[in-house]
A protein has these predicted regions:
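A generic transmembrane alpha-helix motif of multi-pass inner-membrane proteins
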Residues: 372-401, 423-456
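Inter-helical loop and helix-membrane interface segments of multi-pass membrane transporters/permeases
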Residues: 3-4, 32-36, 66-91, 104-164, ...
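Membrane-interface "cap" regions at the ends of multi-pass membrane proteins
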Residues: 1-27, 56-61, 65-78, 82-87, ...
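Select transmembrane alpha-helical segments in multipass membrane proteins
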Residues: 5-16, 41-44, 83-97, 145-151, ...
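Membrane-embedded translocation segments of transport machinery
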Residues: 2-6, 168, 172-320, 324, ...
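Loop-to-transmembrane helix boundary motifs in multi-pass membrane proteins
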Residues: 5, 11-13, 19, 141, ...
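Transmembrane helix-boundary motif of multi-pass solute transporters/channels
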Residues: 11-48, 235-241, 251-255, 259-260
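Membrane-water interface regions at transmembrane-helix termini and the short interhelical loops
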Residues: 32-36, 84-100, 135-137, 150-174, ...
Length: 456
């Protein structure tokens, strides 16, 4: 069977950017920027994106394009005879499932909050009332199961329709809508009373805040955010490399995707900080920002129901674009392994992922166990820890070593594939850094993540 191909370069860029763009761009990056000294943090973040994320992204794409296989079989085609690199293909495949075991639920939260906002559920509520809405959702599994099932069924239906007719066409609509809604929200924020103060806090370098947070924490924070924002290490980018032509270089395409991901992260702060300063709300991050702080702000804002609806459809699309990309990876791996049709594999995985997502849902109520406290307190936190702190950094390290080591695919093969086509080219002078220094940095990120979780 001839391998499917993406119809257009735009489709490839938007799908790959959609995979990279996720909820972390919104609920983590702006908060870390504010705490990390504003523009100084952004500068560090951009430096680390170029140093860390960009090279590894070119490697995932290059392996995918050279192999023309899904992550689970790509190593087998490219690795030296008798080597064991292909074991990571299975680990990456499992990592995709583990990510979806909680990401489908969180995407469902976004859809639920879009529905609540559109129907006026938050109108007239004080801060305690808004908090109660969030707690009610967490303690009523039926609500979360319903929205999680909606996410999985719709996502798998789209993927089952084929690469071009399903994933590519729908992702173009989702991503363009996401970017347009973002810009509308940012423009609205610029006209709020506290916009100037909020933007100053967000973007102007502030040495005192760097000293307060600690220069070491700011540097490691920027490094971690730059590394994890691109969803590298589980083959989510590799799969789309396998669908594209040889017309463009992988570095040039990766730069475009990184720019889109960074644009979304920075504009998220342009939306959030003017609002928090206008209404005198403390800066927060994570679920507290999205599901408690911002609904309170929209309650106080003129036309808040409208702007809140825009915001949660933006968040839903940001999360759903990642879901679609990972679903495609899972289905492609399943097709390669079983030789079954796309529709058969999609139906099987739709049922499987719904079942695998249930522990996350029940982890806030009947399956809330004390032993989960070191990970954050819930099954979602445990699953997130395994993906973010174990599978992603170690997976990125494997792709990196596979491309630079003579015991793997090797530097020459990587450079030849990466530099095919028009666009920016990787240079041979980068070899020392990519071979000897970058692996140490990635290993540091892995070790620091474990230390920060359990020993700090």
């Amino acid at each position: 069977m001839e391998r499917e191909r993406l119809k257009s370069r735009l489709g490839f860029i938007l799908i790959s950017a959609g995979c990279a763009i996720g909820i972390g761009n919104v609920w983590k990056f702006p908060y870390m920027t504010g705490k990390g000294g504003g523009g100084a943090f952004v500068l560090l973040y951009l430096i680390f994106l170029v140093m860390l994320g960009l090279p590894i992204m070119t490697m995932e794409f290059s392996v995918g394009r050279a192999a023309r296989k899904s992550p689970v079989l790509a190593y087998q085609k490219l690795e030296p005879a008798g080597s064991k690199w292909h074991i990571h293909g299975i680990v990456a495949f499992i990592g995709n499932y583990l990510l979806m075991m909680f990401y489908t639920t969180v995407t469902g939260w976004m859809l639920h909050y879009f529905y609540l906002t559109v129907t006026g559920r938050f109108e007239g509520l004080d801060s305690d009332g808004v908090l109660d809405v969030f707690n009610t959702m967490l303690t009523q599994p039926v609500i979360m199961i319903f929205w999680m099932v909606v996410v999985v069924v719709v996502g798998m239906f789209i993927v089952s329709r084929g690469l071009e007719a399903g994933l590519e066409n729908i992702t173009k609509i989702v991503m363009v809508t996401l970017l347009v809604v973002m810009i509308i929200l940012a423009i609205n924020s610029f006209f709020l009373k506290g916009a100037a103060e909020g933007l100053k806090y967000y973007l102007i370098p502030n040495i005192s805040r760097i000293e307060e947070t600690g220069i070491g924490n700011v540097i490691t924070g920027a490094m971690n955010q730059a590394f994890f924002t691109l969803s590298l290490g589980i083959g989510a980018m590799l799969i789309f490399g396998s669908y594209i032509s040889n017309d463009r270089s992988m570095l040039g395409e990766s730069v475009t995707i990184v720019i889109l991901d960074t644009f979304v992260a920075i504009v998220s702060g342009l939306i959030i900080f003017p609002a928090t300063f206008t209404y005198g709300v403390d800066q927060t991050s994570g679920p507290a920002l999205i599901f408690i702080t911002l609904p309170n702000i929209f309650n106080k804002m003129p036309l808040g129901r409208l702007w809140g609806s825009f915001f949660f459809i933006f968040m839903s699309f940001a999360a759903f674009s990642t879901v679609l990309a990972v679903f495609e990876n899972i289905v492609s791996c399943g097709m390669d392994l079983t030789k079954k049709s796309r529709k058969q594999v999609s139906l099987f995985n739709m049922i499987l992922i719904i079942l695998l997502s249930l522990p996350c849902v029940f982890g806030f109520s009947i399956w809330s166990f004390g032993w989960l406290k070191p990970f954050g307190g819930s099954i979602l936190d445990l699953e997130d820890f395994l993906v973010s702190n174990i599978i992603l950094p170690l997976g990125s390290l494997v792709y990196l070593l596979f491309c630079v080591s003579r015991y793997g695919w090797g530097w020459d093969n990587y450079m030849k594939e990466c530099n095919k086509g028009e666009g920016l080219k990787m240079k041979n002078w980068m070899r020392f850094y990519l071979t000897y220094i970058l692996p140490i940095i990635v290993l540091f990120i892995f070790v620091f993540g474990i230390y920060d979780k359990f020993f700090k």
